[in-house]
Amino acid sequence: MAAPQKKAKREGRQIVFVDESGISERPTRVRTWAPKGQTPIIQFHFNWNHVSVIAGLTRTNCLFRLHEGSIKKEEIVDFLKALKAHLKAPLLVIWDGLKAHRSRLVREYLDGLGGHIQIAFLPPYAPDMNPVEYLWAWLKRHALANYCPNNLGELHSTARNKLKSAQKRPLIIAACWVQATLW
């Protein structure tokens, strides 16, 4: 991965790691507390719908979009358009080998940009090299820990608010990069 990073630096490209994840209505149970003899209980219903989120992590910022259902090639192209519009500079997008990332629709979109967005793939089975994975860990194990929404709309709204709070906290973004041991 060092070669794409060096080339990006030479060409003045901004490096953006991209990844997708799902957030379930089912709570991520972490540490709980209750007085001795009283078992802590998290009440939830058994209709475990989910919200999908796609995020791009730069050295200083996190850009994201939430979707109901799975993220498909169309949502990936929409996200790449948003990245291009928001970041302006030429980009090096680094992501995993998800089939949708290699789809014809995504390739055609990228080919039509005249090289404004270039792509590099992470090695197979190397999620620990992607700093966005650590953003997901923070979101699920800290920001949404033990959170039990009443419905999908509430989950969507809360996840959006938590990710917006991460955008305003540079230490969270920096910690994701440190955890991935990239800088």
Task: Enumerate the language-model features and the residues they cover.
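Short functional hotspots at interaction and active-site rims
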Residues: M1-W183
